[in-house]
Amino acid sequence: MFVTILRSTTLLQLKPKLGYNKYLTRLRTVSLAGAVTLAASAYYCYECFWNTSMEFIHHPEAIEKHVLSIFADIKYRPTFYIPHRLMQLAYATRWEKKLDTEFERQLFKLSDGGQLALDWKNKHVVTNKPLILITHGLTGGSETNYIKHAAETLAEAGYQVVCFNQRGVSNCELLTSRYHFHGCTNDLREVINYLQENKQKGQQIFGLGFSIGGSLLLKYAGEEGYKCMVNRIFSVANPYDLLDCSHNIMKLRNKIYDWSITCNFKMLLKQHQSSLAENEKTKGIQIQEALKAKNTYEFDELITRRLFDFDSPEQLYSNIGCGNYIKDVKVPVFIMHSKDDPIVPQFLVPYDQIKQNPNIIVALTNKGAHVEWFTGLKPQRWIMNPILRYFEEIQSL
C-alpha cells in the first residue's frame, strides 16, 4: 500500500510531463491498485483477527450438542506473518524447532509375526483419567512435531498417552515383508484389544487421530459399531474419500503437498528396501522405479496397490477412507477442520452424511491449513487447546 501511495505522489510530479489523458489513465490504474491493496489488507485483518470463532456442523439432535458451550471462548488467530496455508506448511517443515520429546517404546508383536511401535508417555502413572490413543498421519509417526506436541500436552495434563505407529514407521524394523496400509484396521484393532485388556480398572480409552490416522479411527469405529472399544474420538483434519483427495492433491496449486508426501513415502521405502525386496517377485512391486516417483499416484501404482492386491491406485484409494463408515459410528466423535485445508478442502467433507449421524460433530476454523494451526508472535501449535478442553470438560459434564 505504501508503494502505491509513493507511486501516486510520483504521478503528481509527472503531471506536467504527461499528456492529460495519459495522466488520468495512469492515475486511475494506480488508484485501482491502491484500492485493491487496501481491500486485501482489510480482508486479511478480518480473517486473522476478527473472524476467529469456530463454526459447528451436526445433527439437529446431536448427542453431545451440549458440549459446544465449552468452546465459546476458544478462538483461532493465526500468526499474523504466516496466515496462508503454504506459509504454515513452510514454517512447520523448515523453521519449527524440533521437540525433544522422550517416549517409552514398546515393540508390539502382531498376530502375523510382524511388529509395530507403541510410544508411551506416563505409561506407569496411576490415574482416573482416560488413556489417550494417538494415531498419526501419512508423513510420519511419533517422531513428528505435531504428535510430540499432542503427547506432551496430554501427558502434562495427567493423561496416559500411547502413540500408535504403523508398521515400519518411526524407525521400527519390519519383521515381515508386510508393509503398513492406512485403509486396514486390523493392526489398530489388535492394539486396541490389547489396551482394553491391560488398561487400568475402570479406565476409558479416548482416540485422537490426525489426518489419515483420524480416518483410520473412524473406520474402525464404523466397523465395530456398538462394540467399539474406543469410548470417544477426536479427529483432526480427517480425510473421508481418498480418491477425491488424490484428485485434489494432484492439482497444480497443491503440487507442493503431493511432493512432500511422496518424499516421505520414498524415505520409508528406502529404509525398508531389504525387508520388502521379496515382494518384487511375489507381488510385482518395483522398488527402484518407485524411488524415482514424482508423485503419490506413481508411488502407489508401483508399490502400494501391488502390495495389497488392488488393480489400480483408484481402487486402492476407494478402500482407504472412512466415508462409507460414517453412518455406522456409534461412539461420540468430534472432528476439527480448517476451511483453508489444502488436503481436505471443504467440498470434500461429507456434511450431509455427518448431519445424519447424531454421534458426530464437526468444528470449523477459517484458517489453520492441514494439521498446522500456528498462533502467536512466536508460532505455537494451537490445535491442542480445543482438544484438551474437550477431553477435560467431557469428563465433568
Predicted regions located by residue number:
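Short beta-strand/loop motif that positions the catalytic acidic residue
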Residues: 329, 335-337, 341
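Catalytic nucleophile-loop/oxyanion-hole region of alpha/beta-hydrolase
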Residues: 167-206
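Short beta-strand element of the alpha/beta-hydrolase
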Residues: 129-137
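The serine-hydrolase catalytic nucleophile loop
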Residues: 140-152, 346-347
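N-terminal cap/lid segment of alpha/beta-hydrolase-fold proteins
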Residues: 12-15, 78-127, 374-377
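Catalytic histidine-centered segment of alpha/beta-hydrolase-like enzymes
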Residues: 368-381
